[in-house]
């Protein structure tokens, strides 16, 4: 194909891997991205567009003849970029970050450029072995027990996201339970989480055939900091056992989405061991912080855990996508997900990652994460997280010092949850006015915050996490919030 002449014009040879073009056009793209980042701070964080804005600007049929990279990038700049929510903006504080870095971006380029598919060891040996190395490196950075490392009998895999990681562990736990009680008992399988657990667990449970009524969300309480209570979990398990059901899985979290709650891993682990349940820990957000020694106490009891996942693309500068999943005993996962086709067999004692994930094809994510760790070192990754936490502490202190506001939940990482004070707003209107405050801030284009409705309370979430955010951006955000509140609260 690369050297096949055009039937209409033999002198025109189509070569999709023209290396001269690659060198020239990649520079155009890198320059475009650089300019985008240079202007990012001045752009409205959220786009001011309406549904269908892009459809009307693009042709309804694909171009028959190719176009130049210059023309394509011009359309990206004029038609695509104005409709983006700028997740890398230093003023983006709505959701947990999709962290970006030079090394992550260039590692992504290497991943795409090498374009290997390491579904078995033999299909690309270096891809598999580098992934083995990287997941062990990260396990040691988190100070996980050696039993989670390949060198200690466990192991890990890089998934695309937490949804896929959780789904894999659910499938493994389901099959492990059914091997014990029989396949005909699948409708009796029950899993447990808290009402603060990410909806990923509900989605994954449905995909593996768990009935909705058997997904038990245990109510959390403010006086217990909204943690999943081990005693409540134990009571729920006992009740279900008495009803003839089969408890098989529990999910704890390090850094929930709404509040940043950290569940008591050690105590949950004891309950899981008592009743032979699979315990998974979702560390999608807060897990990354545990490379810092001051946060590693949140992992106390992790030796009682069957699996743990963490999104490096949230806080460890890897760019999307990169999710670590570790298991103490990978065999249950492999037995559940193994592909048996003869042509897929690796024929070696090495890991075949096709048996550690849902899909067969897989990206060379390890080279990107390896590049990030090597380029910055553990010390700079720790400093990056500490810097974000420090700015979050600064923001929290400014909010707490203004009597028009109140902190909803004690900050654990770099998420600050706050609202207008009920004492400074008309009776019963604090949530309504807090929502109005958030909407006005967001509509200004100068910042982007998110909100949560929890019971009758509405509060604002402010996450510090963009790689470009500096103290001045946090100070500017606080001034914007104060000025906006002035027109809402007298």
Swiss-Prot record:
Listed CDD domains: DOPA_deC_like
Gene Ontology cellular component list: cytoplasm
EC number: 4.1.1.108
GO biological process, one term: carboxylic acid metabolic process
Cofactor(s) needed for function: pyridoxal 5'-phosphate
Biotechnology: Yeast engineered to express 4HPAAS together with Pseudomonas putida DDC (PpDDC), Beta vulgaris L-tyrosine hydroxylase (BvTyH) and Papaver somniferum (S)-norcoclaurine synthase (PsNCS) accumulates (S)-norcoclaurine, an important precursor for the production of benzylisoquinoline alkaloids (BIA).
UniProt keywords, alphabetically: Decarboxylase, Lyase, Pyridoxal phosphate
Reaction catalysis annotation: L-tyrosine + O2 + H2O + H(+) = (4-hydroxyphenyl)acetaldehyde + H2O2 + NH4(+) + CO2
Record-linked Pfam families: Pyridoxal_deC
GO molecular function: carboxy-lyase activity; pyridoxal phosphate binding
Coiled-coil segments on the chain, per record: none
Modified residues (N6-(pyridoxal phosphate)lysine): 314
UniProt: L-phenylalanine binding residues: 97, 198, 313, 343
Cited function: Catalyzes the production of 4-hydroxyphenylacetaldehyde (HPAA) directly from L-tyrosine, tyramine not being formed as an intermediate.
Subunit structure, as described in the record: Homodimer.
Family membership: Belongs to the group II decarboxylase family.
Protein name: 4-hydroxyphenylacetaldehyde synthase
Protein species of origin: Rhodiola rosea (Roseroot)
Organism classification: Eukaryota, Viridiplantae, Streptophyta, Embryophyta, Tracheophyta
Name of the gene: 4HPAAS
